[in-house]
Amino acid sequence: MKNFEVLQPLQNSLSGLPLWVSERILQQINQLTHYEPVIGIMGKTGAGKSSLCNALFAGEVSPVSDVAACTRDPLRFRLQIGEHFMTIVDLPGVGESGVRDTEYAALYREQLPRLDLILWLIKADDRALATDEHFYRQVIGEAYRHKMLFVISQSDKAEPTSGGNILSTEQKQNISRKICLLHELFQPVHPVCAVSVRLQWGLRVMAERMIKCLPREASSPVVALLQHPFRTTVAREQARDDFGETVGAILDTVSTFPLIPAPVRTIIQAVRSSVVSVARAVWDFFF
């Protein structure tokens, strides 16, 4: 179904408004449906960044980094399914080189404002976290804590390792201790996740948590780019709610424009709830 056909019910819900106002609202809703999220993924060498991305996301992947760019620039990859795009920024992990960490601090300060979310991968068997903690406090700081989702990766390597196809009770207990340790060290805004790509363990919960952590405008296109098993009811309903709330916020913003006459502002406020309901109803056609 074409976008203009999907927009028709929304247009009908705005029919009481002057044409230029309804067109402005529809234009912003259309832009919202084409929002391109940018997600950073960081972790030390061998943390499993690529395997996690491949496990979570579907779509065609194309590198977008300029080969002539500065070597300090992070690698960027663009994912596409249909009309939906997302960029993944591969950020270097800290704690492997003191000289590099100074460079990385500058890189992160430059990149953080542009990212919707950062997945910070910490290996289940990584005990050297002092540098990570320092970096989190000094570089990420209060301003961007809400953008960080900590993920314990390679949970199948938690002690005692067995190489089997399921996590043992002892491994799960040690993973729980690791989660508590990370909460204690970093005091993150969002709950810490734990996954094993090899065992396909914890990925659904992590995907749902990621959708909940994203800014409202970003959650729907990310859901559209998830592998099918992770497009769960929980993830989809969170994104649908976010989409409706964002459409409502668009109406609120337009109603505050200085050129909007008071009677038109009253109409916008009167139709807000019905427009949000329609937006939620047509979400499936967009995403």
UniProtKB/Swiss-Prot annotation:
Entry keyword set: GTP-binding, Nucleotide-binding
One GO cellular component term: cytosol
UniProt-annotated binding residues for GTP: 43-50, 90-93, 156-159
Segments crossing the lipid bilayer: none
Stretches assigned to the G domain: 48-140
Gene Ontology biological-process annotations: tRNA methylation; tRNA wobble uridine modification
MF (Gene Ontology): GTP binding
Keyword Nucleotide-binding in annotation: yes
Pfam families: MMR_HSR1
Domain of life: Bacteria
The family this protein is said to belong to: To E.coli YkfA and YeeP.
PANTHER family, per the entry: TRNA MODIFICATION GTPASE GTPBP3 (PTHR42714), TRNA MODIFICATION GTPASE GTPBP3, MITOCHONDRIAL (PTHR42714:SF2)
Name of the protein: Uncharacterized protein YfjP
Organism encoding this protein: Escherichia coli (strain K12)
